A protein has these predicted regions:
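Short acidic alpha-helical/loop segments enriched in Asp/Glu that coordinate divalent cations
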Residues: 138, 158-167
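Active-site helix/loop of acyl-thioester processing domains in fatty-acid/polyketide metabolism
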Residues: 21-34, 146-162
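N-terminal ordered "arm"
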Residues: 1-66, 70-72
Length: 175
């Protein structure tokens, strides 16, 4: 199950520099045991980011599997979570609206495989983005890093196929 929760935030101390602090808010809401599991994983089955759309700040949380959905989005969409405070900040941040979009993986795969692909795609990064290669952060990603990241995210969303492992552990065609 693929899910995206969008929360419209209202408060004086919201800006893009707080997006890493929102990670802390998220970790405080989930079960301690699940938070520990996430810290041990090399690839998280979720992403979160803060964007500004016109005059609204929108905090987005996306999950790639059922467990992440239950542990994260279910807790964040709860009626009792209507405001929070970022550590070391004075004022509360209110959540004025929540929107949940759920898509079954089968529907996504059907769309991906049955609709004709384009020859060219434009990629627009909505937040600052970096990729890790050989333990170093790359702030200017190349196509191989983008593909690698997409394959890892896909593999994290399914138990049926590990795309990344297949690609990087298979013998080369010349062998």
């Amino acid at each position: 199950m693929l899910a995206k929760l969008e929360m419209i935030l209202e408060g004086e101390e919201i800006d893009y520099r707080n997006s890493s602090n929102l990670q802390g808010v998220l970790m405080e809401r989930i079960d301690t045991e699940y938070a520990e599991i996430l810290h041990e994983q090399r690839l998280n089955p979720y992403s979160q980011y803060l964007i500004k759309n016109e005059n609204q700040y929108i905090w987005c949380i996306q999950t790639l599997n059922e467990e992440a959905y239950e542990q994260m989005i279910q807790k964040m969409i709860s009626q009792d979570f209507s405001e929070f405070q970022i550590k070391n900040k004075k004022s509360a941040i209110r959540i004025t609206e929540k929107k949940l979009n759920i898509q079954k993986k089968a529907n996504l795969m059907e769309q991906f495989y049955e609709e004709p692909g384009k020859k060219y795609y434009n990629i627009e990064f909505m937040t600052p983005t970096s990729f890790k290669r050989n333990g170093q952060y790359q702030i200017f990603p190349d196509l191989s890093l983008i593909y690698r990241s997409l394959m890892k995210k896909y593999s994290a969303s399914t138990e049926e196929l590990d795309m990344y492992c297949l690609l990087y552990t298979s013998p080369s065609p010349r062998d």
